[in-house]
């Protein structure tokens, strides 16, 4: 019984052992994944950075925008590159784009710098004694003058000279607010709130195209979708270093000299259902607007201080006709066609059947009229003739063919960007003024009202210049390039070898993101090229910025833009050094693919390697593990620190770290050299002692024997020599030769040393051969023993498996028999129910 019980216990142990072995084999079959660092991967994140500008300005042109652009911008790239990103979808939001804010600040800087060297009109903030201007009625009836002018006389501050000048009624206000109609005392409109600066007499403010560029380490993504509305995902994306040339045209209601839609008209709004939000319309065909100030007049120069002059319209005793009368003309057919398309588009978006365009409901002159700069004068044109029509799906009422003439007023004192405390006095321009522009967009607002109504009223808007820049920057966004990526691989770092080579330079910067739409496996193949393009782009941009900064330093006009360029230059180098510092901390300096000892945690991402490397892009992968990137970085750093400690302890053992180096050729040469030195030293000592011995004997009167004299060899203690009475063995004595002379002694010693070395070396070789023979024999026996043991255990495993299968089969059979027996009994019981009922009834009847 005990034997059977032990046998059963052994069988159970074998069963559990086989199960554990299977579990271990299953666990070992799962491949371990390790974190691998990649440098040069196409990954970016949304960012805010300092942009710099590029332009084709000419320093010899005295126009204000040219002067500003010469000082503030770098030259444009003669061969701009735009690289399409395949399989990339990116979200854009034109209403929350920091590029708009930066451009707004930059254009303010443009105007401020243009006005900086000009005269401040603080001495002109005095009382003006004004009367109505006497005009000659020579008008042709087509254009009516809407605003009167005042002929004013005043004394310049700190002077007694009385000056006469004409001012537009819009530029002056009566001092006595209670009696505005009959008042004769006036002041300039902005004297009590703003500092008025007179524009330089030769400034015309003619805008030139300005490109806004991202510094090195950053890129600008561009949406190339022709129907993109400014917000949401865009699947047709490219990367550029600079935007297209944007003309900083200051205007309201109508957008001038911008870009056109390539297909149909595009309506853009942050929230079209919110009537407070501005509606930006991008036309698909431009409409020419020609503005003219048809009358000439003269201007006078009044000295108001040391090297300071005020330019005004001559007022005293000079009849100049309708001075300042201006107008703009637009093709009625082109405007009618564009407005009809806008109405149709708005009707579809707002779900309205009738769209009515009406003039502005009121506000500042910049909002109620179309404001633009024409030849240096600021025109304020009445657009009520443009926005006065109704459009529906069946019929429309509006303009006929012909020309629409917009009456315009001219203001000399203009609020700059609606900023408190900033105003500009535009000096009068002599001669005729003509300018031609292209209407490429509209700024509109809607009245709102009942949502269930089928009617909607649209009015012109504007005033916030950010909307002007937004109409051009809607398709751009700035991103920060993150060239370091981590991903799981099967490779694990074994030994850290410190690399001293640096990553090379070459190619161009934009090619770095060219592989953004490729899978991770395809993109990782070109890491070296992409890393070189990253550094090359930094160097290329730094050279351009440095040239611009050097030019500013030469002109001694290093402005805010110069500081921005310095910031961009330093920022790019700092970002590159930061990435290199991270790679150095992780032990990955100079490497594009760097394995680590950090195991990949499936909680970060449980995707398979094939799914990661064959189906995902680097951007998709980065979004998936973005929450764990900081943790992975810290684990890599801790692993590298521990590895450096281990490496230090290993290096302290010095040459024991690698025993194989003992058998290198350099080591063998060193061994031979050491052997020769030892042999030479022994021979030298032998010679020295022999000479000293001979000299000592000669001094004692001893004469050396000849070379043929044989001396008896001392016998051992077991071989006694001949004694006095009984003779021993003498016939087999050996003798040694006593040499005489330095060279003979040297030869004898060298011969004996060689013989000694030969015998010892032979003995050593024989011993080594014997050891190798024994080791081989023992090793062979050990291999045979292991083979037999392996066969034995394999047989045992087979027997155990067979026994386990037999046991399982027997147990299954027994349980199956029991189940069958139970089923049979149940069936019999069911079948016997009628019989039992019958028997019971029979007993009851008996």
UniProtKB/Swiss-Prot annotation:
Transmembrane intervals: 675-695
Location of the region described as V2 in the Swiss-Prot/TrEMBL record: 152-191
- The annotated region (Fusion peptide) lies at 502-522
Q: Where is this motif: Di-leucine internalization motif?
A: 845-846
Region annotated MPER, chain positions:
652-673
**Which parts of the sequence are annotated with region: V5?**
450-461, 453-461
Q: Where is this region: Immunosuppression?
A: 564-582
Signal peptide positions are: 1-31
Q: Which residues lie on this side of the membrane: Cytoplasmic?
A: 696-846
Modification note? Highly glycosylated by host. The high number of glycan on the protein is reffered to as 'glycan shield' because it contributes to hide protein sequence from adaptive immune system.
Residues with covalent lipid (S-palmitoyl cysteine) sit at 754, 827
For molecular function, the Gene Ontology terms on record are:
structural molecule activity
**One Pfam family from the UniProt entry?**
GP120
Residues linked to a glycan: 87, 129, 151, 179, 182, 229, 236, 257, 271, 284, 290, 351, 382, 388, 392, 395, 401, 438, 451-452, 601, 606, 615, 627
Q: Which segments sit on the Extracellular face?
A: 32-674
Q: Which Gene3D superfamilies match?
A: 1.10.287.210, Human immunodeficiency virus 1, Gp160, envelope glycoprotein (2.170.40.20), Single helix bin (1.20.5.490)
- Give the span(s) annotated as V3: 291-327
Q: Where is the stretch described as CD4-binding loop?
A: 360-370
Site positions (Cleavage) are 501-502
The similarity comment for this entry is:
Belongs to the HIV-1 env protein family.
HAMAP family found in the cross-reference section: HIV_ENV (MF_04083)
**Other facts:** Inhibitors targeting HIV-1 viral envelope proteins are used as antiretroviral drugs. Attachment of virions to the cell surface via non-specific interactions and CD4 binding can be blocked by inhibitors that include cyanovirin-N, cyclotriazadisulfonamide analogs, PRO 2000, TNX 355 and PRO 542. In addition, BMS 806 can block CD4-induced conformational changes. Env interactions with the coreceptor molecules can be targeted by CCR5 antagonists including SCH-D, maraviroc (UK 427857) and aplaviroc (GW 873140), and the CXCR4 antagonist AMD 070.
UniProt protein name: Envelope glycoprotein gp160
**Gene name linked to the record:** env
């Amino acid at each position: 019984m005990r034997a059977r019980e032990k046998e059963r216990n052994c069988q159970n142990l074998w069963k559990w052992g086989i199960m554990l072995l299977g579990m271990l084999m299953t666990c070992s079959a799962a491949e371990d994944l390790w974190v691998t660092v990649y440098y040069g991967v196409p990954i970016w994140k949304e960012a805010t950075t300092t942009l710099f500008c590029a332009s084709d300005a000419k320093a010899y042109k005295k126009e204000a925008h040219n002067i500003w652009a010469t000082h503030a911008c770098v030259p444009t790239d003669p061969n701009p590159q735009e690289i399409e990103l395949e399989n990339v979808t990116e979200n854009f939001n034109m209403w929350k784009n920091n590029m708009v804010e930066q451009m707004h600040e930059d254009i303010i800087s443009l105007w401020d710098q243009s006005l900086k060297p000009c005269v401040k009109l603080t001495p002109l903030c005095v009382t003006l004694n004004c009367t109505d201007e006497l005009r000659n009625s020579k008008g042709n009836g087509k254009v009516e003058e809407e605003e009167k002018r005042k002929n004013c006389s005043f004394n310049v501050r700190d002077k007694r000279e009385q000056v006469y000048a004409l001012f537009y009624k819009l530029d002056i206000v009566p001092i006595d607010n209670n009696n505005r109609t009959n008042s004769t005392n006036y002041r300039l409109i902005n004297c009590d709130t703003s500092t008025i600066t007179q524009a330089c007499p030769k400034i015309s403010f003619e805008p030139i195209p300005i490109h806004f560029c991202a510094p090195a380490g950053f890129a600008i993504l561009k949406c190339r979708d022709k129907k993109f509305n400014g917000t949401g995902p865009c699947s047709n994306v490219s990367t550029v270093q600079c935007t297209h040339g944007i003309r900083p045209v200051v205007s309201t209601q109508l957008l001038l000299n911008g870009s056109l839609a390539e297909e149909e008209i595009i309506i853009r709004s942050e929230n079209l259902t919110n009537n407070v939000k501005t509606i930006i319309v991008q036309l698909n065909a431009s409409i020419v607007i020609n503005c003219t100030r048809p009358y000439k007049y003269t201007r006078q120069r009044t000295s108001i201080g040391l090297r300071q002059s005020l330019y005004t319209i001559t007022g005293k005793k000079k009849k100049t006709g309708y001075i300042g009368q201006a107008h703009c003309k637009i093709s009625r057919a082109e405007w009618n066609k564009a407005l009809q398309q806008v109405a149709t588009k708005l009707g579809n978006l707002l779900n309205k059947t009738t769209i009515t365009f009406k003039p502005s409901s009121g506000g500042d002159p910049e909002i109620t009229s179309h404001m633009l700069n024409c030849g240096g004068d600021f025109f304020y044109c009445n657009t009520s003739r443009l926005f006065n029509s109704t459009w529906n799906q069946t019929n429309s009422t509006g303009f006929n063919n012909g020309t629409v003439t917009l009456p315009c007023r001219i203001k000399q004192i203009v609020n700059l960007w609606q900023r408190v405390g900033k105003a500009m006095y535009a000096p009068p321009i002599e001669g005729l003024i003509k300018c031609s522009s292209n209407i490429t967009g509209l700024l509109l607002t809607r009245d709102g009202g009942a949502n269930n109504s089928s009617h909607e009223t649209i009015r012109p808007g504007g005033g916030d210049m950010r909307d002007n820049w937004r109409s051009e920057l809607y398709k751009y966004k700035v991103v920060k390039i993150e060239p370091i990526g981590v991903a799981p691989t099967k490779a694990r770092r074994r030994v850290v070898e410190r690399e001293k080579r640096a990553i090379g330079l070459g190619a161009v910067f934009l090619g770095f993101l060219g592989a953004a739409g490729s899978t991770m496996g395809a993109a990782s193949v070109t890491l070296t090229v992409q890393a070189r393009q990253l550094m090359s782009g930094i160097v290329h941009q730094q050279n351009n910025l440095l040239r611009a900064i050097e030019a500013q330093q030469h002109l001694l006009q290093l402005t805010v833009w110069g500081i921005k360029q310095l910031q961009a230059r330093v920022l790019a180098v700092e970002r590159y050094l930061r990435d290199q510092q991270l790679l150095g901390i992780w032990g990955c300096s100079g490497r594009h693919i760097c394995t680590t000892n950090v195991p990949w945690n499936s909680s970060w991402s449980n995707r398979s390697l094939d799914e990661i490397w064959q189906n995902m892009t680097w951007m998709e992968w980065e979004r998936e593990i973005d929450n764990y990137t900081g943790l992975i970085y810290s684990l890599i750093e801790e692993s590298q620190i521990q590895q450096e400690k281990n490496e230090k302890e290993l290096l302290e053992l010095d040459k024991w770290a690698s025993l194989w180096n003992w058998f290198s050729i350099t080591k063998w040469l060193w061994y031979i050299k050491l052997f020769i030195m030892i042999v030479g030293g022994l021979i030298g000592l032998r010679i020295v002692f022999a000479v000293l011995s001979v000299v000592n004997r000669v001094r004692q009167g001893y004469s050396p024997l000849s070379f043929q004299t044989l001396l008896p060899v001392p016998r051992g203690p077991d071989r006694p020599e001949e004694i006095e009475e009984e003779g021993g063995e003498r016939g087999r004595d050996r003798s040694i030769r006593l040499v005489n002379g330095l060279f003979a002694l040297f030869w004898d010693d060298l011969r004996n040393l060689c013989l000694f070395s030969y015998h010892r070396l032979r003995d050593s070789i024989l011993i080594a051969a014997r050891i190798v023979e024994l080791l081989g024999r023992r090793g062979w026996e050990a291999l045979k023993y292991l083979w037999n043991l392996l066969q034995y255990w394999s047989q045992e495993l087979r027997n155990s498996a067979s026994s386990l299968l037999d046991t399982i089969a027997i147990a299954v059979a027994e349980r199956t028999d029991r189940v069958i027996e139970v089923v049979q009994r149940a069936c019999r019981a069911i079948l016997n129910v009628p019989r039992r009922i019958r028997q019971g009834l029979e007993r009851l009847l008996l």
